A protein has these predicted regions:
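Nucleotide-activated chemistry modules centered on ATP-dependent adenylation/adenylyltransferase
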Residues: 1-240
Length: 240
């Protein structure tokens, strides 16, 4: 989403590889994201010299099988525009679009090889299903997740080998909290999209997604320092 969590994940990758991210960045474009998110994504990709790729569910968009078009539920819309789109992008079954960093334009990606692993910036405290994920979370040959078939992870022991034709999702931020994220952003001075801050109307976004389903919260926080204070001792203290 190029929100705070994925931006922190990118920052960690840049630190690990001395300012360079040697793997593609995949974004799923639902076409309902807040415009500032897309603008920020592209600006960051050019500034940090990221190998930026995006994918989409063209069939669902053309059929208007979406919640904003009034033809399906929010949950089914998320499945259509996010889950199914991600599956086809990872498998290489749908068109991927790659950014030309010189022009900022996107062109169909000639590489259709499947991705066998993807690093994701989800956190266990975001919602129930994510709390059941592992650091190394396998998907089967249909890209489906069997929550009952998760490998045990004890201390620093992780299963990192998986069957051919499957892929693994890696969650380095699994045990980070929202406060951890913002404290790290403050410590490292990481840039984030301005939607997270009160810009004079008494509201800001705590999380970002599609415009029809993402709503701002009442807040006076205009800076990272004020967001940290709000999460530590303010109105959002201990509230997910």
């Amino acid at each position: 989403s190029i929100g705070k969590d994925s931006t922190v994940l990118l920052w960690l990758a840049r630190k690990a590889f001395f300012g360079h991210v040697p793997i593609p960045l995949v974004h799923i474009d639902t076409h309902f994201k807040i415009l500032e998110m897309i603008e920020y994504r592209d600006a960051l990709a050019r500034q940090w010299k990221l190998e930026m790729i995006y994918g989409e569910n063209v069939d669902a968009l053309c059929a208007k099988d979406t919640f904003p078009d009034g033809n399906t539920s929010r949950i089914q819309c998320c499945k259509n525009l996010k889950t199914e789109a991600l599956k086809s992008v990872l498998s290489g079954d749908s068109i991927r679009y790659r950014m030309d960093r010189q022009t900022g334009n996107y062109e169909p990606d000639k590489n259709t090889e499947p991705f066998t692993g993807v690093i994701v910036g989800v956190r266990s405290d975001e919602e129930g299903s994510r709390s059941k994920e592992r650091y190394f979370s396998p998907r089967d040959k249909n890209n489906d997740w069997d929550v009952a078939d998760q490998p045990a992870e004890l201390w620093n022991q992780f299963k990192t080998e998986f069957a051919p034709g499957t892929h693994v999702r890696i969650h380095p931020l699994q045990d980070w909290t929202e406060l951890d994220i913002w404290e790290y952003i403050l410590r490292e001075n990481i840039p984030v999209v301005s939607l997270y801050f009160n810009r004079g109307n008494g509201t800001r976004y705590r999380s970002l997604g599609c415009a029809p389903c993402t709503k701002p919260v009442e807040s006076t926080a205009r800076s990272v320092e004020e967001i940290v204070a709000e999460l530590k001792d303010g109105k959002f203290s201990n509230i997910a």
